[in-house]
């Protein structure tokens, strides 16, 4: 199996992109809203008083207040609703009623379940238990921390069921079914905050961030796809000041172009498997509406790294880029295959930059906790 050098593409923005004369308004993730609903319901269960608003902590340490739309007694405990405000992001879950039904259980600790409107995971590759609810790790942790602010989970047991009225209908407008999540939406979010990234304004903010680094005399810009990869990048390059780290989201091409335009000498990219696979295929604007993970490329990388034909076939048929990563890891091929993938991304970025900058690439695990592969300065 071979894979030639791909053509370089930087697709246009989605049709939802708008240039606005004022700053875009951020919103809250489904995970943050589910956390707030949980705390409201549990507070009412403990105190007998339904709160009009609740305060929760976000992963970065900031604390925010959410209005509670409804908080009622039920046969199973207390049910509370927080309505999602997605800000200016074109999010199909804007206005969704994140509902938490909270009751006691006999065993100490927290039991978190998905109710109607929350999807069920049916395929591997998402980092979630197959057969379980589509509630991602960060929202699970946020909910646990919010519960622990109200009761001592070492002493009492709490059961939380998250549901979303009309969630199954909302999910039809998402990629959930293709990913193997059926019956509803996912409870998502790594920061608790929704940033309206699929807009021309977000791309402009990426370019501006590179400009600021250049204006301060820095020679290297470090491109990260999100909060976890930025934390990993800071661990990898602790000598660089904060201004060098740019959260590019889907706009890697725009950031590289800005780095060349403003005379920087180096670009480092730190990402996870899915985004790296898109870049390796020559796609420099990686919004999900404009690109998909090229699994045939990952299959070719598998063979090149010494993997068997059966493993290459499994990778090519994987459900997601993460699923391919997990197959490599299980086969003991994550290091060699990941290094090759990073090398391909490095080649793409250098070509896109016309060899005007040096390029280093690192792949980190899905927790952003460790570097698992690299090309350039981090190569073994």
Swiss-Prot record:
Keywords: Cobalamin biosynthesis, Methyltransferase, S-adenosyl-L-methionine, Transferase. The keyword DNA repair does not apply. GO terms for molecular function: cobalt-precorrin-5B C1-methyltransferase activity. The gene is cbiD. HAMAP family: CbiD (MF_00787). It catalyses: Co-precorrin-5B + S-adenosyl-L-methionine = Co-precorrin-6A + S-adenosyl-L-homocysteine. Belongs to the CbiD family. One of its GO terms (biological process) is anaerobic cobalamin biosynthetic process. Pathway: Cofactor biosynthesis; adenosylcobalamin biosynthesis; cob(II)yrinate a,c-diamide from sirohydrochlorin (anaerobic route): step 6/10. It comes from the Bacteria. The keyword DNA damage does not apply. It comes from Salinispora tropica (strain ATCC BAA-916 / DSM 44818 / JCM 13857 / NBRC 105044 / CNB-440). InterPro entries: CbiD (IPR002748), CbiD_sf (IPR036074). Its EC number is 2.1.1.195. This is Cobalt-precorrin-5B C(1)-methyltransferase.
């Amino acid at each position: 199996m071979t894979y030639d050098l791909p053509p370089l593409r930087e697709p246009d923005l989605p049709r939802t992109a708008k240039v606005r004369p004022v700053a875009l308004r951020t919103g809250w993730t489904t995970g943050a809203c589910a956390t707030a609903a949980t705390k409201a319901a549990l507070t009412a269960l403990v105190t007998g008083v339904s709160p009009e608003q609740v305060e929760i902590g976000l992963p970065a340490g900031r604390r925010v207040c959410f209005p509670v739309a409804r908080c009622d007694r039920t046969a199973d405990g207390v049910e509370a609703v927080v309505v999602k405000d997605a800000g200016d992001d074109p999010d199909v879950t804007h206005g969704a009623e994140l509902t938490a039904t909270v009751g006691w259980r006999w065993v100490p600790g927290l039991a978190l379940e998905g109710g109607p409107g929350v999807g069920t995971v049916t395929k591997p590759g998402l980092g979630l238990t197959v057969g379980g609810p589509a509630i991602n790790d960060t929202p699970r942790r946020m909910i646990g921390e919010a519960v622990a602010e109200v009761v001592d989970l070492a002493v009492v047991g709490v059961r939380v069921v998250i549901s979303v009225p009309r969630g199954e209908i909302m999910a039809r407008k998402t990629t959930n079914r293709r990913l193997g999540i059926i019956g509803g939406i996912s409870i998502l979010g790594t920061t608790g905050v929704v940033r309206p990234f699929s807009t021309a304004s977000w791309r402009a903010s990426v370019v501006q961030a590179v400009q600021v680094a250049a204006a301060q005399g820095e020679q290297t810009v470090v491109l990260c796809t999100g909060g976890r990869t930025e934390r990993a990048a800071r661990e990898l390059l602790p000598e660089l000041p904060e201004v060098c780290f740019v959260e590019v989201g889907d706009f890697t091409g725009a950031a590289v172009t800005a780095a060349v335009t403003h005379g920087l000498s180096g670009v480092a990219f730190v990402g996870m498997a899915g985004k790296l696979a898109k870049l390796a295929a020559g796609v420099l604007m990686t919004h999900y509406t404009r690109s998909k993970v090229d699994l045939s490329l990952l299959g070719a990388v598998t063979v090149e790294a010494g993997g068997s034909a059966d493993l290459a076939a499994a990778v090519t048929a994987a459900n997601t880029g993460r699923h391919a990563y997990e197959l490599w890891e299980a086969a003991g091929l994550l290091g060699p295959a990941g290094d090759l993938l990073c090398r391909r991304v490095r080649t793409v970025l250098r070509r896109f930059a016309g060899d005007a900058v040096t390029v280093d690439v690192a792949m980190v695990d899905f927790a952003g906790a460790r570097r698992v592969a690299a090309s350039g300065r981090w190569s073994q």
